[in-house]
Amino acid sequence: MGKVIGIDLGTTNSCVAVLEGGKPIIVTNREGDRTTPSIVAVGRKGDRIVGRMAKRQAVTNAENTVYSIKRFIGRRWEDTEAERSRVTYTCVPGKDDTVNVTIRDRVCTPQEISAMVLQKLRQDAETFLGEPVTQAVITVPAYFTDAQRQATKDAGAIAGLKVLRIVNEPTAAALSYGLDKLHENSRILVFDLGGGTLDVSILQLGDSVFEVKATAGNNHLGGDDFDAVIVDWLADNFLKAESIDLRQDKMAIQRLREASEQAKIDLSTLPTTTINLPFIATATVDGAPEPKHIEVELQREQFEVLASNLVQATIEPIQQALKDSNLTIDQIDRILLVGGSSRIPAIQQAVQKFFGGKTPDLTINPDEAIALGAAIQAGVLGGEVKDVLLLDVIPLSLGLETLGGVFTKIIERNTTIPTSRTQVFTTATDGQVMVEVHVLQGERALVKDNKSLGRFQLTGIPPAPRGVPQIELAFDIDADGILNVSARDRGTGRAQGIRITSTGGLTSDEIEAMRRDAELYQEADQINLQMIELRTQFENLRYSFESTLQNNRELLTAEQQEPLEASLNALASGLESVSNEAELNQLRQQLEALKQQLYAIGAAAYRQDGSVTTIPVQPTFADLIGDNDNGSNETVAIERNDDDATVTADYEAIE
């Protein structure tokens, strides 16, 4: 087996490492650098340029130089409007509403652009090692969706690499930090602020096991955003002074972008920096062209004011990760800062202040730590590293749609992967021959508030009374965090499934808001769930009443039937208009009273005729959304969803 390389495929820069003598080392590229800009360009003659050389010619070839492609990979067109407005190259809608880019009249997918970067990294590794390289471990942000992870694997395949594992970036950073501390028992918080993403993970290290306890983050907050506030500041000031909008000139905006990035870097070590851009534009004065220049001083304090909202936004994922892991700041032993943007002094100060003055660990290189960790995982998979176990997690819960538009979680967020969950359901209408499984991701109680991942149908179920068919539903997540869902009819053996490879990922707003909304709307969600549960109990009760009435009509008088039917109709009407907890409690009392009436009539019917046939009231849907290990039956139902003319996946769980 040849060498397995570890790759940090970054938004701004990428890095490759390999294990030598049991230790990870950075591979120096052909230009002599330890990192490679994640930039691809096509020259006038159609020649492809990657890395530092592509960055050098970006100003004079702005329209055909692609950067920050990681912000588009695996995402939908409508979710990327802000990102598309910032780049100097041309974006076009792709297949399945994805984002493609145009370079010299050729349309490329983000996977193809990423593959060009990966191909250069692979070639640099082959030159360094003196042997062919065909296998790799690639890192991705912890908050990357299933579609983004799959797209990254596809990019690796295009580059001629077999991707053995997709590893979360903060987890890889912890690996590089803890390789020589395998027998330490400690809790580590990794704060990873890269060019385009922010991830925060909390890991437990001990007995050679790296176990991720919780992860949180922002998929679209990184160094690019800090550059953008300087770009906007420069462009706004120039517009005010010269009445020229530099945003309309792609070459000018590219120069502003590069100068802003350098200013940000300078201000990490200097209190002030000068931005000097001669001949940035030309104005006409008295009929003659007059060149315009930018020469301005930017102080660190000014930059921190411009970026204050961004700095504050980096703290929220820390709070969320601590909450999810049930830990306090005092229980964190070490804080690791990784990613190039973690060098910004305001970021370091904000993190230190949040942890009550505890100094972050700055012993690892923030640009290289992730690639080094990927190389360690590559060594584990290649058999070079022994006795190291990495246990990662999923960032958001996965589940399906059930009765009443409820999102039923099958696998909770922060569950260790790889993992699988299997549950057996049954139909809830007589003669049902098909179910549609709707798979979702998120934390809210109702389907409409979560992200749809995909749908599939299981057909060919033999017609049978409700409750008879047994449908086995399985959720399986591999070590890369990629989801497979399958459904099988136990009676016929007929099966159907889906590999969630939908290209549309979560928007940045969705990811940021999803967990906040789960808390903000917790009370409203609970009322909605109780209302749906009550409605389900009522439907089961009405089904029981109608079935009993059909089989034993001769034993019930009209005087007994009429008030029951009136009560049922009144309760049905009330359930359609309930809007608060007081009304809910009133309806709950009415339902209980109706139950007692039915039980009394049933008992009387039994006394009259011992052969009476009754249909028992089914257990409620509340069982399904509670503890699934209590051995009780759990009821869900199939119903027609008239909004999209499809049958939603609603079942009765019997195991």
Curated annotation (Swiss-Prot):
InterPro entries: ATPase_NBD (IPR043129), Chaperone_DnaK (IPR012725), Heat_shock_70_CS (IPR018181), HSP70_peptide-bd_sf (IPR029047), Hsp_70_fam (IPR013126)
UniProt keyword annotations, A-Z: ATP-binding, Chaperone, Nucleotide-binding, Phosphoprotein, Stress response
Induction behaviour: By stress conditions e.g. heat shock.
MF-aspect GO terms: ATP binding; ATP-dependent protein folding chaperone; unfolded protein binding
Post-translational modification Phosphothreonine, affected residues: 197
A Pfam entry, by short name: HSP70
PROSITE patterns, sorted: HSP70_1 (PS00297), HSP70_2 (PS00329), HSP70_3 (PS01036)
Keyword field contains ATP-binding: yes
Keyword Phosphoprotein: yes
Function: Acts as a chaperone.
NCBIfam families, alphabetized: PRK00290.1 (NF001413), PRK13411.1 (NF009947), prok_dnaK (TIGR02350)
The family this protein is said to belong to: Belongs to the heat shock protein 70 family.
Identification of the protein by name: Chaperone protein DnaK 3
Organism (species): Synechococcus sp. (strain ATCC 27144 / PCC 6301 / SAUG 1402/1) (Anacystis nidulans)
Gene that encodes the chain: dnaK3
